């Protein structure tokens, strides 16, 4: 009778521990959903972007400083609007709307956090 641990059993256990550790570490590094920024519901939007069928329509809009864009979610899938700089972030929605007022000139790129191929741009240009 032998009381030693076999090499195979030792390696199997080590690989299992390493795999479980890697899974925990990677889960801790996952970006998760961005924190929503409240909608500017009290502001009248001058442009509406429809969010449907894995696209923003229109994908590019131009407004003046102080104006707002409203994203109208019309299903059937869940989407959000997340600015590259996180200056505006909607919740994940199937239906409903999200409005953001832009005060500074610039180009604001955004995408859907769960469908990153969905991309759009808001250009804020002084008249």
Show where each model-derived region lies.
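Extracytoplasmic copper-binding redox domains, predominantly the cupredoxin/blue-copper superfamily
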Residues: 2-127
């Amino acid at each position: 009778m032998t009381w030693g641990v076999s090499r195979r059993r030792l390696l199997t256990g080590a690989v299992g521990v390493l795999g479980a550790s890697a899974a925990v570490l990677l889960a801790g590094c996952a970006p998760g959903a961005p924190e929503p920024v409240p909608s500017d519901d009290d502001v009248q939007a001058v442009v509406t972007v429809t969010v449907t069928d894995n696209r923003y329509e229109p994908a590019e809009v131009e407004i003046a400083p102080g104006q707002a864009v409203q994203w109208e979610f019309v299903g059937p899938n869940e989407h959000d609007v997340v600015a590259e700089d996180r200056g505006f972030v909607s919740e994940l929605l199937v239906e409903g709307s999200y409005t953001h007022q832009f005060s500074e000139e610039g180009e604001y790129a955004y995408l859907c956090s769960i469908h990153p191929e969905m991309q759009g741009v808001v250009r804020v240009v002084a008249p």
